[in-house]
Every structure is written in structure tokens, then in C-alpha cells.
Amino acid sequence: MQPPWGLALPLLLPWVTGGVGTSPWDYGLSALAHQPGVCQYGTKMACCYGWKRNNKGVCEAMCEPRCKFGECVGPNKCRCFPGYTGKTCTQDVNECGVKPRPCQHRCVNTHGSYKCFCLSGHMLLPDATCSNSRTCARLNCQYGCEDTEEGPRCVCPSSGLRLGPNGRVCLDIDECASSKAVCPSNRRCVNTFGSYYCKCHIGFELKYIGRRYDCVDINECALNTHPCSPHANCLNTRGSFKCKCKQGYRGNGLQCSVIPEHSVKEILTAPGTIKDRIKKLLAHKRTMKKKVKLKMVTPRPASTRVPKVNLPYSSEEGVSRGRNYDGEQKKKEEGKRERLEEEKGEKTLRNEVEQERTLRGDVFSPKVNEAEDLDLVYVQRKELNSKLKHKDLNISVDCSFDLGVCDWKQDREDDFDWHPADRDNDVGYYMAVPALAGHKKNIGRLKLLLPNLTPQSNFCLLFDYRLAGDKVGKLRVFVKNSNNALAWEETKNEDGRWRTGKIQLYQGIDTTKSVIFEAERGKGKTGEIAVDGVLLVSGLCPDDFLSVEG
């Protein structure tokens, strides 16, 4: 029943005369009350709970989740299309399983529908019944036949099937291989007999987010489903993960082993070690009567190592702080003097050389047989030889990986890290990339952070490098300032020996923030890419500079 005009007129006047209200929704006209989903709130008309206004101003129902194969007719209420059922119309109805059966002979359920087929010797009629047909009996179809204008022929129950060459057997159509399947970019196609479906890529899972289903990344690290070693850190990536060994461990991340640490003090105090043999050799000096030519070289036992606990490089923190060379060298000399005093006891050795038979206490003659028994190795470090050649140069930065005042940093955005390796003479370390690190074309970067350089017109960068092994990879050097400029590259080293590279850096180098050593893995399985002592010299590179090989 319509309200009296006396009541309706005051409600209409503001809208007609251009008042604040501009829509009949704000004044509860009775005509709106007959629309579905419209409710009266006091003197106003608005969409009921569970309904919302569309762009045409009509209230429409809301369903969450949406009706997949149907329409929303009320709040969270779906009306399914024929062939589908369920709360959100996602379940297929098996028409072949209901009673009465829709087909006389064979019934094949399809997605959202069904198809009828007749036994051999029968023909399918429009009303889904079958009639005898001698022609169909001769065809001997796999799934049945149908009557066409050209005559009876075999049919397949799905659009994902096709008739074989004999015209009787149905073969599967691989929609994934034929590009007929349409899957989102983050899903992959899986073929089935007569159809296909879309599945999330490996490392992703299907979730309902933002009113739709989507494939999201699986965080294997958070779910603890990764195979990383207990001594490795798990780093989640899109669709996968990475394993990196923790500080103090080495390996591929799946298997990590402790980096061995050998103490110099333990070696010297072990029973029957080289300490006793040195005393024996010193006692033998009085028996020598032949004049010998002395070589002023300090021997080191091959088994003695610099303790790795003092290695200034930290793979966990990514940054290496250089140590004070003078302070540590002073401590080593004091420790050496204390050990010599313990060995001498109350005896004192004359620190002078007698031409006929007396040797200094800290020098050994190569003609003494006991020297071979001691298995002594005379240390000739290539780094020292290299620096002797540059002793007259103005060195601005002098860096190595065991001594020196400089900062080294691993790149956290690359594919693998550089690792410290023992030098051949067991004294100190250099940085290397083994051939088994990473995969082909993977990149590992090592940065040398430069301090505030004194402005100069030119600089020369000197460094020792080695590419050992067949097809081990490439070594590049970048100079980082406003942009990363490739300054040097080496792809192979035929003999695999240590060499020294030099790069002339011209005016403007004082604005450089770092020098980057980049290793790119090849397909070789043996060898390594290595870098050692780095020098930054003020001025031009010397013309008489010779590469140091070792």
C-alpha cells in the first residue's frame, strides 16, 4: 500500500528542489522497497546486509568465495548451472550415477555434463536411445557411433580425444604439448587422458588469497623442509632455497665440515718433534771442520701453519678487517725468542760465525745431512719477491688475506663465496674459487674496500692471480665508482702457474669506492681461480715490471 501523499511530499521536496539529497536512495521511496536486497533503515532505503550496490544503482548479492559455475542469488547463496553442485558450484554432477539413468546403453560423465553411447551394432538417436543398425555393427567402434548425413561414424566422448587412423579407436590429445592449454604464468600444464589441468610450479602451493586462488612461494626455510646441513644457513628464494655453510665450516651447504685448526704451540710441544732434531743439529756443529758458504735464509718446518683462528676473513659477516702487521710481527718475534731461551737452558751460544767449524744458532748449512732428515723447506714466498721488486714504489694500499691493513667483503647477491686456501709453503692464505663451486656461468664476487685515497693523477693496481685447470672459468676485475667499469679479464692460463696482473688507473681513481674481483665458473671439474697480494701504487705502472710466476 502506498503512503499518503502528505507523507511522501516532504520526502520528495529536497530531492526535487536540489537540496542536499540527490538520490531517491536517501529518502526511502516506496518503489525501491519492492526491489530484492533493499531494506529500510529509519527513513532511508539502503542495500541489506550481504548485498551491495553495483554501478547501475541496483543491489546485488555478495558470495565469498564466488560461485564458480553458477550465479549468486543471495548472501553466500549460489544457484548452480546444470551439471554442477556444491556450496560454490565447484563439484561436477555425475549424471550417469543418478536414477533414472539418462542413457539407454553407455553413459560417460564429462565436466558439467554427460554423453550417451550405444553398444556396437546400435545407433544413437536424438532422444538418447539406441536402435539397431547393421552399419554401426560393422564399424566396431570403441565408444559407440552416431548417425550423420554421411552415415554412421565412430565418436569420442571428450574434446580432448580424437579418432585414430583406423577411425574406431580414440587417442588422447596432449593439450600441453600442442599449446591448446591455457594456464597462468605461475602454473604448469599437466596432461590427462582426454583433458588437462593446471598445477603450481615446484616450490609453490595453491592458496585462496584476495578473493581468488593463486600460487604462492613455499618458504622451505621456515617450514624446515630443506635438506641443508645443521651447520648451514638456509636462504629462501622464489620457488626454491639456498644452503650456505656457517662461519668456521666449509662445503656445498648440504654437507658442511669443520675447517681444521692447527696450533703452532701444540706442534712445538709435541714429544719427538722438530724441536729435538734442532737441538741435535746444533750439537753437531762442533764436528764441522770444513769451511762452508752460508746462505742467510730462515727455514720453516713444512708442517707448521699460521693458526687459522687468526684469519682476518669472516665468511659469516662478509667483511674482513686487516690486522696490524707490526704488532703481530713483534709478538711472533718475542715468542720465538722465548722458545729459543727454553731450548738453550743455561747454555749460551756465541752469535758469531767461525770460518772453519762454527755456525750461527739460527742458520743451517745445506750441506749438513741432518737437514734432509728434518725435511726443512726454505721459504721463498712469491709475495715477498714481488714486493722486493716494488720496494722503491710509492705504495698506497698493500693488502693480502692474512696480513695487511685493508677490508675485504663478500658480495651477498652473487651465487657463491670465495674461500681461503693454504699457500703451497704453508705460510698464510690466499682466496680461491674451487672448480666444484657453484655451476657453469655462476658468479662469485670479492670486494676490496678502498679508504679515502690521497688525490693523485694516476694509480697502478698490481695483484697475483692463478687460473689452474682446464676450462675452470674466467677472472675479471671491476673498478667501482659512479659505475662498474670492467678493467681487466683473463679466461685461461695454460700452465696454471701464479702470475701478476697490472691495471693502469688514470685520473679520478680517488673517487673509487672498491675494486671487485669477479670469478665466473666454467664447465671444468678440476683446478681453481685464485687471487693473492694486492698493491695499489701511486703513479704510472713501471715499464720494467716483471710478472712473478710460481
Curated annotation (Swiss-Prot):
May bind integrin alpha-8/beta-1 and play a role in hair follicle morphogenesis. Promotes matrix assembly. Keywords: Basement membrane, Calcium, Cell adhesion, Coiled coil, Developmental protein, Differentiation, Disulfide bond, EGF-like domain, Extracellular matrix, Glycoprotein, Repeat, Secreted, Signal. Residues 318-354 have a biased composition (Basic and acidic residues). Gene3D superfamilies: 2.60.120.200, Laminin. This is Epidermal growth factor-like protein 6. Belongs to the nephronectin family. The keyword Calcium applies. Expressed at basement membrane of pelage follicles (at protein level). Residues 55-90, 92-131, 135-171, 172-210, 217-257 form the EGF-like domain. Disulfide bonds join C59-C72, C63-C78, C80-C89, C96-C107, C103-C116, C118-C130, C176-C189, C183-C198, C221-C234, C228-C243, C245-C256. Residues 295-354 are annotated as: Disordered. Pfam families: EGF_3, EGF_CA, MAM. Glycans are attached at N394.
